Amino acid sequence: MEAIANLHDPLSGVVVVLLADFLRQHQGWGWLRLVAGATPYKEVPGLTMVKVMGSGHGGGFSLRPSATHQGLICTFTHLDLALQFLDSPAVQAYRSRARECWSGVMAVQSARGHWDKQAWQASSAQSLGETGQDAAQAPGPFAVLTRASIVPTKAMAFWRYAPAAQADLDQSPGCLLAMGLGEAPLVRQCTFSLWQDQQAMREYAFQGSHQTAITAAYKNDFFSESLFVHMQVLGMSGQWMGKDFGDDLGMDAVQTKLAANSSEQEAAHV
């Protein structure tokens, strides 16, 4: 794993997310992944960050932990290295042991905040390859990653808002996928969600129970650190919660999407 030279320099590159719901006979294998953490990935080319995380019951936001659900979030210096990882034995090991597994590669459009004192920034043209431009607004599937370190003495106050926010998320018509993740029980939490477009995400984020929870979090200083990341989905593969998301994680498919998005952005400025 490539070292980050300076924590004061924002982390830039391409994001990979993998979600797994392990078969019962492979729960032990999944547990060992959590125990090992980042250690097995130290030699992965281009990898700059990796988080192996558990989840709440059913893959949701419950205080009750799931014995089968798990998530992997990684950042890479370059798109081709991210795709190489998604085709590696390490990822195939997850897929072969899972009842359902979803994986995706994404370009960061915008980011605010920090994760382990490290800021993030938009994916550069260099990280996306020769046909890529700096990540910008684009049509199609849109992903959101949020994470927070919750002040321990305020954890229970924060969690009182979770059930209503999840209920609204489950009922949101534009949400294609959502999973609650955690680095540590109660106090280091993360959410990954996939949306049909940005408008659908905004309709959920800025009204109802979610807006109430966010307002309370800032008013009461629930977080000691937080990060909010908006991402363009470049490719995804697998099944989740009974939905089939296809398989377009090949380099040709991803580069075709990047080229199409670049053409649409150029046309919009004519």
Regions from the PLM with identified roles:
Residues 75-77, 91:
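Aromatic- and glycine-enriched beta-alpha-beta binding-site module
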Residues 89-97, 211-214:
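A common structural junction motif
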Residues 188-215, 221-222:
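Glycine/small-residue-rich hydrophobic helix-like segments
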